[in-house]
Amino acid sequence: MSKKPVLVIMAAGMGSRYGGLKQIDPVDPYGNMIIDFSIYDAKQAGFEKVIFIIKKAIDEAFREGIGKRIEKYMDVEYVYQELDVLPKGYEVPEGRVKPWGTGHAILCAAEAIDGAPFAVINSDDYYGRTAFEEIYRQLTTEQDGATYQYAMVAYDLYKTLTDNGHVARGICTADDQNHLVGIHERTRIENHGGQAEYTEDDGATWTGLPQGTIVSMNLWGFTPS
């Protein structure tokens, strides 16, 4: 019997823009957090287990602020993203303190995922229920095999902008069959009077992005292979 899809949430980031654990900051008058909306939508879509990737340094605060509440409704497992969790033959360079990134975060969760199909998201982005329904459908209907049938939920860039500062997005290129061809990360995109523009030189110059541009917000689905 095939395993049910699990939800993996990358929550190791310290939220430096807000001076603390931004995934634990409420976003509405009722004390709900962005991560609460994601988990609720994922559960409604069919997910029954969530794996939180966190740092040891935030373990207690995370469990108290989020984990214990979620444990009432879903199976919960915690894994740590640590620098020394590396493939055989690799070592941490001397002086390295910065986390390796999202791929490494998933590597740290490999044992907890335990061969199940899984979706992975950021802890601090809002995705919407339809996105979780689509990725769950993909993970429960796609036949795994040598062709690696993985998936990403894409968004219209213009629907992911904010009037308050800038956003970082992965600008996607797809072929005529909606197969992902490439992603180019733009770390500073702003809404300038209804026109999305990005800069790579700290605002000295800006380049426009057209309507219809699709972006990644790090909602991926992977089959066991």
Predicted regions located by residue number:
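Residues immediately flanking
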Residues: 11, 123, 155-157, 224
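Conserved N-terminal catalytic core of the sugar/cofactor nucleotidyltransferase
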Residues: 1-15, 29-122, 127-134, 140-141
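Short loop segments at secondary-structure junctions
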Residues: 30, 175-178, 224-225
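Active-site mouth loops of central-metabolism enzymes
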Residues: 21-30
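Short N-terminal binding/cap micro-motifs at the start of the first secondary-structure element
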Residues: 15-19, 161-162
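Conserved core of the sugar-phosphate nucleotidyltransferase
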Residues: 129-218
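Conserved beta-strand scaffold positions in the cores of enzyme catalytic domains, especially
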Residues: 24, 76-78, 150-152
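A conserved hydrophobic position in a structured secondary element of the catalytic/binding core
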Residues: 54, 221-222
